[in-house]
Amino acid sequence: MCDSFVVLGSSTADGRTIFGKNSDREPNEPQSIHFFPRLTGNGTDLFTTTQRVSQVSETNAILISKPSWMWGGEMGVNDKGVVIGNEAVFTKETVRRDGLLGMDILRIALERSESAEHAVKTIVELIEDYGQGANGGFTKYLYYHNSFLIADRENAWVLETSDSYWVSKKVKGSAAISNCLTLGDDFDDGHPQVIRNAENHGWHKPGKAFSFAESYEKKLIRKFSGAGTRLRRMQELLEEGEVSIERSFEILRDHENSKHLGSMRNICMHAGASLVSSQTTSSMVVVLGEKPEIWITNSSVPCLSVFKPVWFDSYESSLPFDEPEDGINYWGSWEKFIRLAILRDSKAKELWREYCLQFEQDLLLTAGKMKADDLSEQAFDKSRNIARKMTSLLEEEEVEAGFFNRKYWNRQNKKLQELKSRNFKKEIPT
C-alpha cells in the first residue's frame, strides 16, 4: 500500500514542483536508494524481475528507491527531471501471472522518458506490449494492477490502469493517488476501448455517464485497504496552503486518521496485529528545480526517521553508498531503533524530536551551501549514529504496545533475522 502526491510550482512555496511518496510494503522487506548512470546500449535485451524486454540505445541516469529483490523501484527520478511513483490498485480485470511488475515499468519509464507526457506514453506502450502483473509480494502473494503519478518541472499526470486498459489526466495545481482508482469521467485520454470493454463485462450501462473508477475498481479492497481514507486525508493536507519541502515531510508523517498499530488508514503506516497490515518502508520527496533535489529516508516510518538530501547528474550521484548492500545495511541500522520505537511510542517521539528534528532542519538550511557529496555523506553518517544513540536510550524503556502487537513484532523480528541470513532472497515465486 502506498500514497503519493505532487504539487506543481504554481502552488509551492518556492515555485518548484514537489513530489512525495510513502512506499508501504511488508515490514521485513528492505528498501534502499540506488543510482544508475546514463548508459549507451550494446544491443542486448533487458532482464527485469519477471521478463526479458527489448532495450533502447541509450538510457537516462536514474535514482530509485527499490525493494531488495526487485529490478525496478517504488519511486524515482531521472536526470531529465521526470519523477514517478506507482501504486497498487485492485481492479476487476484478471491480473496476469507473467506481466511486468509496476515497479519495473516505473524504472523503464524513467530510463527512457524525456518528460512526464513522454513517460505516460512509455508506460502505456509497455503495458500493451508486455502486460502488467506478476506477484509483487515479498513473502506473501500479492497481485495487482498499477496507477502512476508522473511529473516533470512544468507538468504532471495521473495514469490509472486495469490490465491493458487505462485513462490519464493532466494535473492542475496538485494531485494525490493511493491504492484506489480516482478518475471518473474527467480523464483527458484513455484506451480506445476502455468504455466498450466495461460495457461488454456489464460494468457500465450504455447511455449513462462513464466513470473509470466506478466501472473497473473492486470496491471492497478499496475499503479494507483504507485507501479512500488516506487519499482524502492527503487531499485535505495539500489544500491547507502552499507546500514546501518541510511541509512535504509533515504530510508523509501524518497520523491523523488512526493512532493504532496495524491501521491501514494512516499516510505514515505502522504495521501491527490486524487482519491486513503494511508498513512504510521508505519515503521520498523530490524537488524539481534546475537540478533534481531528492530527500530520502532510506528507512522505515518517516515519523521516526530523518529525510536526507541526495543530488545526481548523468554520471555521478552524492549517494554515499559504494555497494548495493550498503543501502540495505543502512536501512537495517535504523530498523533496530524503529522496532523498539513502534512499541514505545511516547518515549520514541521524545527522542525523535530531540535528536532527529533539529538535525533535519539543519540539513534543510545547509542544502545548497555545502558540496553535495560532503553534505549527503555527513547526513547519512550522522543519522546512522543518531539511530544508534536513540536505540541505546530506548532499549531499557517500558513497552507501551498491547499484547497482540508485542506478539506480532516478536514474530516479525525473528522472521527478519531468518531473511537476513538468506540475504533477503525472495521466498516465493514472482
PLM features: what roles do these ranges have?
Residues 105-112:
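Second-shell loop/turn segments in exported
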Residues 112-120:
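Short, charged, surface-exposed loops that flank catalytic or proteolytic processing sites
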Residues 118, 131-135, 260, 371, ...:
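Residue-level signal for secondary-structure boundary elements
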Residues 119-128, 245-259, 376-383:
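Short, well-structured alpha-helical segments that form the helix of a local strand-helix-strand
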Residues 241-269, 273-278, 359-360:
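Accessory, solvent-exposed terminal regions and/or long lumenal/extracellular loops of proteins
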